[in-house]
């Protein structure tokens, strides 16, 4: 999560970090990978049958993943792929919430009010004014146009697939994640690497685009957005509780999650249950 503290030389001076040629080559390769991903995968794909996921694996090279995907297909009927560009968790939550609000006007109105509250909170926490006028106002206007009917469902998905507009909207989610952590810094400080403050962590790991979300960011965004999320894991060793799925918040298992994400190593997509009459529950 944090870089190691700089080592001091014999004179007590901090040694300067040296970027090697190999590191530069690796960075270039990583950038090219992101660019290739961007060209081949939309930011937010159309709904697809869950069977497409199963078809990605075979018994010879990925038997465990094939088995898990097949098991999940008994409960989940559709998947919406999200571009893997370092923003996939934030974007998946954004898409999940927008889908809810497209069908639930009261929820949309509540989220607009909440977004205005977060804008004020950002100002109170000392975020630059331009942050609020640019990203927050843009997102709230987007929601208001959904509410007024200016943005149809088709228009919404067009916007969510436009890099410029979609990333402006996405930035709002990074900002409220950062604000939530700063508001609750005493609670979360023990989970941050030694030598780094909550503010430094947010500035380095949350606020910049293309930074993957770790467990701290995941919990914070879900709580800041006021939603309930289930994450299904293809590999149970990645789950915080060692199970096949994990609910956030985890305080009341009787309340169904609103959004379900599928986690594969380093990536999140949105998945959707079959009708209750078709699906059978997966055991932990």
Swiss-Prot record:
> Which is a GO BP term held by this UniProt record?
proteolysis
Q: Name one Pfam family in it.
A: Peptidase_C65
User: Which of UniProt's keywords are assigned here?
Assistant: Hydrolase, Protease, Thiol protease, Ubl conjugation pathway
- What InterPro entries has UniProt attached to this entry? OTU_dom (IPR003323), Otubain (IPR016615), Papain-like_cys_pep_sf (IPR038765), Peptidase_C65_otubain (IPR019400), Peptidase_C65_otubain_sub1 (IPR042468), Peptidase_C65_otubain_sub2 (IPR042467)
Q: What is its EC number?
A: 3.4.19.12
Top-level taxon: Eukaryota
Q: Any idea where the OTU domain is?
A: 77-274
Instruction: Cite the active-site annotation.
Output: 85, 88, 245, 267
Q: Please name the GO terms that the record assigns under molecular function.
A: cysteine-type deubiquitinase activity; ubiquitin binding
Which residues are recorded as binding substrate? 176
Has UniProt tagged this entry with the keyword ATP-binding? no
Q: Does the keyword Hydrolase apply?
A: yes
Catalyzed reactions: Thiol-dependent hydrolysis of ester, thioester, amide, peptide and isopeptide bonds formed by the C-terminal Gly of ubiquitin (a 76-residue protein attached to proteins as an intracellular targeting signal)
Q: What class of enzyme is it?
A: hydrolase
Example GO CC term: the record gives:
plasma membrane
Its biological function? Answer: Hydrolase that can remove conjugated ubiquitin from proteins and plays an important regulatory role at the level of protein turnover by preventing degradation. Specifically cleaves 'Lys-48'-linked polyubiquitin.
Protein family per UniProt: Belongs to the peptidase C65 family.
Name of the protein this chain belongs to: Ubiquitin thioesterase otubain-like
Organism of origin is: Caenorhabditis elegans
What's the encoding gene here?
A: otub-1
């Amino acid at each position: 999560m944090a870089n190691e503290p700089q080592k001091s030389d014999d004179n007590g001076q901090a040694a300067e970090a040296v970027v090697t040629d190999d590191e530069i080559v690796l960075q270039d390769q990583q950038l090219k990978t992101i660019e290739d991903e961007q060209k081949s995968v939309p930011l937010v794909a159309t709904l697809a049958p869950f069977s497409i996921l199963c078809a990605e694996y075979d018994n010879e090279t990925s038997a465990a993943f094939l088995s898990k995907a097949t098991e999940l297909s008994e409960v989940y009927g559709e998947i919406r792929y999200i571009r893997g560009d370092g923003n996939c968790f934030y974007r998946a939550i954004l898409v999940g919430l927008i889908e809810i609000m497209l069908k639930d006007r009261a929820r949309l109105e509540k989220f607009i009010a909440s977004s205005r509250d977060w804008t004020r909170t950002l100002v109170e926490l000392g975020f630059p004014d331009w942050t609020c006028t640019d990203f927050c106002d843009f997102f709230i206007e987007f929601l208001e146009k959904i509410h007024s009917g200016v943005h149809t469902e088709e228009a919404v998905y067009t916007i969510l697939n436009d890099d410029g507009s979609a990333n402006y909207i996405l930035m709002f989610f990074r900002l409220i994640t950062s604000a939530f952590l700063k508001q609750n810094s005493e609670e979360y400080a023990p989970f941050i690497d030694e030598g780094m403050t909550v503010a430094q962590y947010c500035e380095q790991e949350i606020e910049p685009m293309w930074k993957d979300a770790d467990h701290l960011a995941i919990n914070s965004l879900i709580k800041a957005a006021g939603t309930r999320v289930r994450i299904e894991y293809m590999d149970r060793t990645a789950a915080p509780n060692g199970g096949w799925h994990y609910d956030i918040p985890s305080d009341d298992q009787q309340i169904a999650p609103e959004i379900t994400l599928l986690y594969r190593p380093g990536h999140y997509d949105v998945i959707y249950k079959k009708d209750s009459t078709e699906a059978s529950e997966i055991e932990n």
